Amino acid sequence: MSPQTETKASVGFKAGVKDYKLTYYTPDYETKDTDILAAFRVTPQPGVPPEEAGAAVAAESSTGTWTTVWTDGLTSLDRYKGRCYHIEPVAGEQTQFIAYVAYPLDLFEEGSVTNLFTSIVGNVFGLKALRALRLEGLRIPPAYSKTFQGPPHGIQVERDKLNKYGRPLLGCTIKPKLGLSAKNYGRAVYECLRGGLDFTKDDENVNSQPFMRWRDRFVFCAEAIYKAQAETGEIKGHYLNATAGTCEEMMKRAVFARELGVPIVMHDYLTGGFTANTSLAHYCRDNGLLLHIHRAMHAVIDRQKNHGMHFRVLAKALRMSGGDHIHAGTVVGKLEGERDITLGFVDLLRDDFIEKDRSRGIYFTQDWVSLPGVLPVASGGIHVWHMPALTEIFGDDSVLQFGGGTLGHPWGNAPGAVANRVALEACVQARNEGRDLAREGNEIIREASKWSPELAAACEVWKAIKFEFAAVDTL
């Protein structure tokens, strides 16, 4: 017998394959305050019991593999393994269930969303024993969330920087999103800002293309910002998209934006990646830049109800990685978003303490222990008739962005911006006077349009525009 064989025998090694549930299904386990908790929607293959499928998820997303290995004896699996501690049925779905998994904190690198996701939503999603798998929710314990810087500034600091209080912020994505020269792009920015918007925005796929290189765009947009500020007396900003092919190039663009003195930059955090995003968020805090986050690619991950990852998880990840704004759907516009579920993850972005509420898709109570909040951005197919609903749904701590709803105005960009600003101010005033925005919204807009020809023209253009499709994302 070789020394190696003796070593295996000495640690009690028994080769072979055994059911995951024998090690990783622990229904009597009491979760710890320091555990990271996950709720998975599991659709196993026919013949795979729920306990085995849930245990397989816990194993393959933590310490397990498909067979027993002799090195198991060199560590304490009981200390490091993930545990499937509860299984519950999904109402109306005979083939699905929710598996709750607890992960010891030591499994994850501090301050790294990249490492967190590499385990929890890594290879486990490719298991043949599962037909589909979706991560519905995460509980991030204070012991882990405190290892993250989080948003560069947060909601209150942003309001103080901008000197804007008591209402949602107004934005606009410049259209057409691709094809404008830098000078014409800057002109469009200026017209929108002078008309009354707080922000304009690069679209998510505006980086540095042949028709408009990033440096030229940054310079012309900065000129537009300063000119609009001088004329209006208000602080203005444009989300300069710093997303690039390399982290080094991204940082170079952020540095140039800071040198221009602009207040905010932007990043596509899913296509750009969490490592790049966290690096940029740290730079923004250190250098006084706000950070706007676009979620391009999210629907590839979160749109399917039985596989992938819900956006509420991506929203939590962004709050840890860092961003001052993030797109969050509109409920009433052209993009997917059911009201209660949307407000559930909006609360996870903004609030400090969020109670478990399954009716809104919140699987776990979340205590952020003073991690700065993120402003949700409503953007996509919205116009002046939506303003009462948006104000009522999202409240003051939000950004309402009207791209086509500004640049599509028949009189041009500046009148489009005026129409949106007048509509917003009318809705905020009506709300503050105690009026019901949900019930009286159209009347409030019609009353305001009597005093604003720009708003009246916008009301006429979009009076029949609706996006009435059933939401895919339901409980």
Curated annotation (Swiss-Prot):
Binds 1 Mg(2+) ion per subunit. The disulfide bond which can form in the large chain dimeric partners within the hexadecamer appears to be associated with oxidative stress and protein turnover. GO terms for molecular function: magnesium ion binding; monooxygenase activity; ribulose-bisphosphate carboxylase activity. Residues 1-2 form a propeptide. Its main location: plastid. GO terms for biological process: photorespiration; reductive pentose-phosphate cycle. It is found in: Plastid, Chloroplast. The modification N6,N6,N6-trimethyllysine is found at residue 14. It holds the Pfam family RuBisCO_large_N. Mg(2+) binds at residues 201, 203-204. Substrate binds at residues 123, 173, 177, 295, 327, 379. Its EC number is 4.1.1.39. CDD domains: RuBisCO_large_I. HAMAP family: RuBisCO_L_type1. This is Ribulose bisphosphate carboxylase large chain. It comes from Viscum album.
